[in-house]
Structures are given as structure tokens and as C-alpha cells.
Swiss-Prot record:
NCBIfam families given in the database record: PRK04966.1
Annotated source species: Salmonella arizonae (strain ATCC BAA-731 / CDC346-86 / RSK2980)
One Pfam family, short name: UPF0270
Transmembrane portions of the chain: none
Name of protein: UPF0270 protein YheU
Amino acid sequence: MIVPWQGLSPDTLDNLIESFVLREGTDYGEHERSLEQKVADVKRQLQSGEAVLVWSELHETVNIMPKKQFRD
């Protein structure tokens, strides 16, 4: 189920994004990006609709994923 990220408090949203970024592992690109940069990137993706915040009833977890990969 998609959760409207706009309904979350800014602190809650930042904490969810930070947790997601930290779970994602190591960057293998040419330039290392800071945690703040990664959080800002994910926030931009949510704002643009490219990514969505998803609640899994089965696992009782929240995740962020590309909208094109989300299936009801």
C-alpha cells in the first residue's frame, strides 16, 4: 500500500529516508556521496513521484521503492 509521504511529519520522513539510505549499502560509483546528499536525492525522488513510500502489511515494514516497480 502506498503511504502518502506528505502526511508525515518532516522529522519522521527524514528518519525513514535516512534508515532506507543506510540499509542500501555501499556506493560503487566514482564519487562517494554524503548521507545528507543521499537523503536529499531520495526526498527529491519522492517529491517528483519517481519513488513511493510503501507499507507492507505482510512484513509490517515501510520501504521506499521506484514507483515503476510498485505493484498493488
